[in-house]
Amino acid sequence: MSNSRPRSRRDAGGGAGAAGRDELVSRSLQSAEHCLGVQDFGTAYAHYLLVLSLAPELKHDVKETFQYTLFRWAEELDALSRIQDLLGCYEQALELFPDDEVICNSMGEHLFRMGFRDEAAGYFHKAVKLNPDFSDAKENFYRVANWLVERWHFIMLNDTKRNTIYNAAIQKAVCLGSKSVLDIGAGTGILSMFAKKAGAHSVYACELSKTMYELACDVVAANKMEAGIKLLHTKSLDIEIPKHIPERVSLVVTETVDAGLFGEGIVESLIHAWEHLLLQPKTKGESANCEKYGKVIPASAVIFGMAVECAEIRRHHRVGIKDIAGIHLPTNVKFQSPAYSSVDTEETIEPYTTEKMSRVPGGYLALTECFEIMTVDFNNLQELKSLATKKPDKIGIPVIKEGILDAIMVWFVLQLDDEHSLSTSPSEETCWEQAVYPVQDLADYWIKPGDHVMMEVSCQDCYLRIQSISVLGLECEMDVAKSFTQNKDLLSLGNEAELCSALANLQTSKPDAVEQTCILESTEIALLNNIPYHEGFKMAMSKVLSSLTPEKLYQTMDTHCQNEMSSGTGQSNTVQNILEPFYVLDVSEGFSVLPVIAGTLGQVKPYSSVEKDQHRIALDLISEANHFPKETLEFWLRHVEDESAMLQRPKSDKLWSIIILDVIEPSGLIQQEIMEKAAISRCLLQSGGKIFPQYVLMFGLLVESQTLLEENAVQGTERTLGLNIAPFINQFQVPIRVFLDLSSLPCIPLSKPVELLRLDLMTPYLNTSNREVKVYVCKSGRLTAIPFWYHMYLDEEIRLDTSSEASHWKQAAVVLDNPIQVEMGEELVLSIQHHKSNVSITVKQ
């Protein structure tokens, strides 16, 4: 009996505590709901945190409301730049809901916007693992995967020849005594594992990318080498002895080279390695044990070049027309691509672009023989140091074939040791692209045998730079040679530095002080060169404006007459003076001359959405050259307070006659949120006004393409010489390959093109967001991919094809995880889904 009272009191106390807790939970829930009603999301969020900490059993009931509150509060914190508070809220939320894919995905989206791509990828990846059917998380993961694990990783790992030669060179070095190895820029760790398998005692590997470092850890562990390879999440320039590695190593292996050899910082890395991480190099004549000396694989490189004619490079880097759909381009506006303009800027920008020249649409024509640009010895510290400070070398190359000088194409031979080498030449079957230096700013690009192509080459800012490209004609060469000296040998040019110096820039036009340089992306230059695009838009806009004119004229004259009667003046103005203008808005991304073209079509008030000052100045100069009255062309962002609210009325009492939207990205994908933008745009149009394009049809076909397979995923262990890498890196494969040139893609068509999808911007009920399409197989083979492109209809008669030869758009392709054997005469059913501007295509079996 004596023991029953304390128990009773405890029970009573527990009951009172539970009742108090329940009341607090109930009040907090009411307060949270009230705060939500008045949009006080921060306080609502705090109340929900209290509720869930006191009553975890309510998680399921309040989950969706809690998510909504979290996301709205996070938006406010983001707008206020309270980043730490925002991240803190998500961490609290994930403690309560650790397996909630929606919260994981939202956290990833915020991190991605802040620039934390590695961390964002982790959350997207987790969200997909939690719910493989969560399409938003999948699309986010695919987008970030392209940033984090660039597609060349797959291509290089599938390059058996490259893997075999690197393995042989490393094996040879280790056998000769280089037993301690540092792998700089380890990637998946494949070179480190080659070294360990070859018998190296100590192997260290450094990788700066968090994603690639974690991937390498998994790969090394899967291959049971984690005990023998020490992985460091750092860049080699930050490695210290003995903090990271106990002592200097005898061998550095690296493949930190890009298409232009130096672009990934190999020179800087190796200077630091020779000074701080490697044993001293063996001097000539010494034959002692290699373990006492340092060496680098690759040992050296020879860089080669060739002057080429290539229409595809030309149309992406030079504006080759003087008139666009009736618009004159003045000579005082000089368009340049970033690859060329980087010569004169202080920014460290790659001074070249890259192309797989063996697959460039239309091919290329060699205008000179292949010539040697430079050699570099990676085992010579002094030579590496002198590269950045050395004066540019002047080179003169004889022309062997007449044609248009479009670019200097560059490749290299990587000499791994005295026996093993790799070439990145376009004639080799290799994973490598070539560096391309577009030629711009010449008075005349036509060259012929007898001419010489002059240039200066250097290694500034750790980039291979080819500058001051000019053409020396035969007649000019002879005149200068005579006045220079009587020495006949000078006519051969060869390596005569004095003659090269005297003749440099003879045909290089110098920029005039009044010129406006306008730097455009290569896709923007290709767009300017796309004549059918601009002529199509001009015709379509003209038709719409013509159809609106009678109505506008009637309305305006009616209003004018009423005003005259009420004022009793009896005076009249010309129709031209009384007509209200048509308002045209172009919100396509990047540089666009469509507003200027619209301005030529009568009483039009065109608005451009370009952001950059140099683009606005260029458009003003073009308008001026075409005799536009001042202030005809307006820049819309000057009238819009919030850039995110780009789509609004031109004036409070006016509507747009035409709105031009960007529906397709240059990559070949549908623009994000395009259907939402179209819905807003429809509400902003006057009666009879149009959105351009009015609708878009998506087309595709079945193909067999080994190339697409190899560019999308590592094809088993055979390619990586028995090492188990594929399952790990293939987690980062994406189902859609972008920036394709279908005209030059190595593939075998297995069907005719079929319509897959309709996106209707003017008539939304005609959209086909989910549909099944039957495709007739006209050739037997392995179905590996479904490339797709678009027909953009400005109206029923005017159509733009994104796969045409003049198109500035590239194409894209869905790549199947598992190829399907198909037989001629068979009929396949494709399931197409369009969700939030993302398209998925699956084969129903």
UniProtKB/Swiss-Prot annotation:
Effect of residue 431 to H: 8-fold increase in MMA production and almost complete elimination of sDMA production
Activity profile over pH: Optimum pH is between 7.5 and 8.0.
Primary location recorded for the protein, binned into one broad class: cytoplasm
Domain SAM-dependent MTase PRMT-type as annotated: residue spans: 137-466, 530-845
GO terms under biological process: chromatin remodeling; methylation; mRNA processing; regulation of DNA-templated transcription
Key words of the record: Cytoplasm, Methyltransferase, Repeat, S-adenosyl-L-methionine, TPR repeat, Transferase
GO cellular component: cytoplasm; nucleus
Keyword Repeat: yes
Catalytic activity, EC: 2.1.1.320
Subcellular location: Cytoplasm
Gene3D superfamilies reported for this sequence: Hnrnp arginine n-methyltransferase1, Tetratricopeptide repeat domain, Vaccinia Virus protein VP39
PROSITE patterns attached to this UniProt entry: SAM_MT_PRMT (PS51678), TPR (PS50005), TPR_REGION (PS50293)
Matches recorded under InterPro entries: Arg_MeTrfase, PRMT_dom, SAM-dependent_MTases_sf, TPR-like_helical_dom_sf, TPR_rpt
Annotated Pfam families: PrmA, PRMT_C
Temperature-related activity annotation: Optimum temperature is 37 degrees Celsius.
Role played: Arginine methyltransferase that can both catalyze the formation of omega-N monomethylarginine (MMA) and symmetrical dimethylarginine (sDMA). Specifically mediates the symmetrical dimethylation of SF3B2. Involved in the regulation of alternative splicing of pre-mRNA.
Quaternary state and interactors: Found in a complex with PRMT9, SF3B2 and SF3B4. Interacts with SF3B2.
Similarity comment: family membership: Belongs to the class I-like SAM-binding methyltransferase superfamily. Protein arginine N-methyltransferase family.
Protein name, UniProt field: Protein arginine N-methyltransferase 9
